[in-house]
């Protein structure tokens, strides 16, 4: 099954799912053999892109990569599973360079969030992140930043869409943040960080005294 779909560089306004289907269908008719698409593929590509940001380029990328996934698996028809694979690939392709290019100190903060989540925590407090971060800095041979500076790095990760950090009131103890990662479930952020920053291997292999909540 050969495809003549190729990446394009065109500026589109945000579209809804129905409009995105109208964009995809003529492209598919020109570039993909008849009967090579499951009927649900174009509606799914359109719905996923509309839910994300309404960008027609994303819808076209989803369709193109779905076809590539089908070709690689030697499938006779592009199916929903290929669209899901394409969605994962796009997410990974978008987030990987962002994680790789984080400064070391911000990688250490992100590591501290992830390792606490792996320990079963969610809605992690700023203090819990900072305590783990101090241990991570020790394993990396780095001097820890102040808690105020780390709070700023957390905010940067939030703005980048890597984590969520929602402010909550602790009454007379002031404000805190409840922090969770936003990474795709199958995305191995630790591997990405260690490949970009070799010292992260020492951090990942280090020992940590992590908190458990009753």
Regions flagged by a language model, labelled:
Residues 69-94:
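Conserved C-terminal helix/linker of AAA+ ATPases
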Residues 92-123:
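Short alpha-helical segments that sit at the start of domains
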Residues 52-67, 76-79:
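The conserved phosphate-sensing helix
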């Amino acid at each position: 099954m050969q495809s003549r779909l190729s990446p394009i560089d065109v500026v589109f306004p945000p579209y809804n799912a129905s409009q995105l289907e109208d964009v995809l269908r003529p492209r598919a008719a020109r570039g993909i053999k008849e009967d090579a698409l499951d009927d649900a593929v174009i509606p799914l590509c359109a719905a996923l892109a509309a839910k994300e940001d309404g960008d027609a380029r994303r819808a076209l990328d989803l369709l193109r990569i779905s076809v590539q996934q089908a070709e690689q698996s030697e499938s006779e028809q592009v199916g929903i599973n290929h669209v899901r694979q394409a969605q994962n690939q796009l997410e990974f392709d978008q987030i990987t360079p962002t994680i790789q290019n984080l400064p070391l100190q911000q990688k250490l903060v992100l590591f501290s969030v992830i390792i606490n989540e792996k320990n079963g925590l969610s809605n992690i407090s700023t203090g819990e992140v900072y305590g783990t971060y101090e241990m991570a800095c020790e394993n990396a041979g780095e001097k820890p930043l102040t808690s105020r500076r780390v709070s700023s790095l957390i905010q940067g990760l939030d703005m980048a869409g890597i984590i969520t950090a929602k402010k909550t009131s602790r009454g007379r103890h002031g404000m805190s943040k409840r922090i969770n990662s936003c990474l795709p479930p199958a995305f191995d952020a630790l591997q990405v960080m260690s490949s970009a920053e070799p010292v992260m291997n020492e951090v990942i292999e280090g020992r940590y005294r992590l908190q458990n909540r009753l």
